[in-house]
């Protein structure tokens, strides 16, 4: 007996949560880790960069694997890598082993992510927006909880080696998720990948189709890349931007919290709205417009009361809404049996571009001596997101399952 709708959605949320918690949880632990192992800042930077790199590099092979073996099996393998690689980081005695385990951990994330769009299309082909919003909220929740709890855990222990405990905790949670996933999804793992599709097996692989030659796939990938650039740029530098504008440390923390808090409702609401409309373009356009308004306010009136609280809320909800809509699109554009390939291509290009956001902003800050040029870059990319949203695939979510 295959698991029901609520169970599959709960499991997808749990998987998504564990694809982010161990990744984001490293950031607050990095200063203690650097001191304890005697690392250079460059070495510490590699530990943060590798998971993002692997999310991009492993997305394409992950998409191919899920189209071949099905989402249940690939997620099982990916979660195993996340649990083992992520958890064993906690006992690594030196940098080389820690880096190798981080590669393993990142590979698990990269392989698993294309499986989630395929899972949603195979089980919920008429409700892709709602179901994508559910698992995407798991990504955001995992990030928020890991970022919020890791610091207090370190403070509570108060020792140089305290960084090991939160990494072990996130690894153990991934292991628990793996056990739950394997037990509940075992009947599905035993089926051929195409079982459950609403089309015959011979129709599930469309000969000659590849996302790399598909215009809609490139538009979707470009939209995902644009939102990724500005999101990771703001996550890295928004506190510094506020500080340079004259904000106090307390106010800056509160404004940054508003930005992060605004992402969670948006990541659910925009995909749900798209299902109700049976269209993707209007919600994507609305989200991109909210982001543009937010960064224009940040550029012109960053600390003016009461508007300063509105700008990060608009920017956070807007970029999160575009992120969620970008995750829906691969399942819309791909022919039956090729959702994994489409998702892999979109994620690979998107995460490769996302890694450039913080770097570009840092280089511009070094060259110009201020964040003014970076603030001009944000609305430019916001305008690009609006243009790409206007071109986004406008396909009613009525396609067959995968």
Task: Set out the residue ranges of the language-model regions.
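Cytoplasmic helix-loop-helix junction between adjacent transmembrane helices
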Residues: 101-138
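C-terminal transmembrane helical hairpin of 12-TM major facilitator-type secondary transporters
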Residues: 280-329
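Helix-loop-helix hairpin linking two adjacent transmembrane segments in secondary transporters
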Residues: 126-130, 134-189
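Helix-breaking motifs and short loop linkers at transmembrane-helix boundaries and internal kinks
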Residues: 38, 70, 91-96, 125, ...
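Helix-to-loop junctions at the C-terminal end of transmembrane segments
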Residues: 58-70, 266-279
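Conserved MFS/SLC helix-loop-helix module at the cytosolic interface between two early adjacent transmembrane helices
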Residues: 57-96
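A late C-terminal transmembrane helix in Major Facilitator Superfamily
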Residues: 331-371, 378
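Extracytoplasmic gate region of multi-pass secondary transporters
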Residues: 26-27, 215-267, 271
């Amino acid at each position: 007996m295959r698991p029901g709708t609520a169970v599959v959605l709960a499991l997808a949320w749990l998987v998504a949560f564990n694809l982010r918690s161990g990744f984001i949880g490293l950031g607050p632990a990095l200063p203690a880790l650097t001191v304890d192992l005697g690392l250079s800042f460059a070495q510490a930077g590699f530990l943060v960069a590798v998971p993002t790199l692997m999310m991009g590099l492993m997305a394409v092979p992950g998409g191919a694997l899920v189209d071949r073996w099905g989402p249940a099996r690939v997620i099982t393998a990916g979660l195993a890598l996340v649990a083992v690689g992520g958890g064993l980081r906690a006992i690594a005695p030196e940098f080389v082993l820690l880096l190798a385990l981080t590669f393993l951990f990142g590979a698990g994330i990269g392989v698993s992510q294309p499986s989630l769009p395929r899972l949603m299309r195979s089980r919920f082909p008429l409700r892709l927006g709602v179901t994508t919003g559910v698992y995407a909220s798991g990504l955001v929740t995992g990030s928020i909880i890991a970022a919020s709890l890791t610091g207090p855990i370190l403070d509570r222990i108060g020792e140089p080696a305290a960084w090991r405990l939160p990494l072990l905790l996130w690894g153990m949670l991934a292991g628990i998720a793996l056990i739950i996933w394997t037990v509940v999804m075992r009947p599905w793992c035993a089926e051929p990948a195409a079982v459950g599709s609403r089309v015959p097996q011979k129709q599930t692989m469309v000969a000659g189709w590849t996302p790399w030659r598909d215009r809609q796939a490139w538009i979707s990938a470009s939209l995902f890349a644009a939102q990724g650039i500005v999101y990771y740029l703001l996550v890295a530098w928004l506190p510094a931007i506020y500080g340079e504008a004259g904000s106090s440390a307390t106010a800056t923390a509160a404004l940054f919290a508003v930005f992060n808090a605004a992402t969670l409702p948006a990541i659910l609401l925009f995909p749900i709205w798209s299902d109700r409309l049976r269209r993707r373009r209007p919600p994507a356009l609305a989200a991109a417009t909210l982001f543009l308004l937010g960064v224009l306010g940040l550029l012109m009136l960053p600390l003016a009361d009461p508007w300063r609280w509105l700008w990060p809320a608009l920017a956070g909800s807007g970029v999160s809404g575009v992120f969620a809509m970008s995750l829906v699109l691969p399942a819309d554009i791909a022919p039956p049996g090729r959702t994994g390939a489409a998702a892999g291509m979109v994620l690979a290009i998107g995460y490769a571009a996302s890694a450039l956001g913080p770097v570009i902003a840092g280089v511009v800050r070094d060259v110009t001596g201020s964040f003014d040029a970076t603030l001009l870059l944000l609305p430019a990319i916001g305008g690009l997101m609006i243009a790409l949203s206007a071109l986004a695939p406008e396909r009613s979510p009525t396609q067959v399952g995968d």
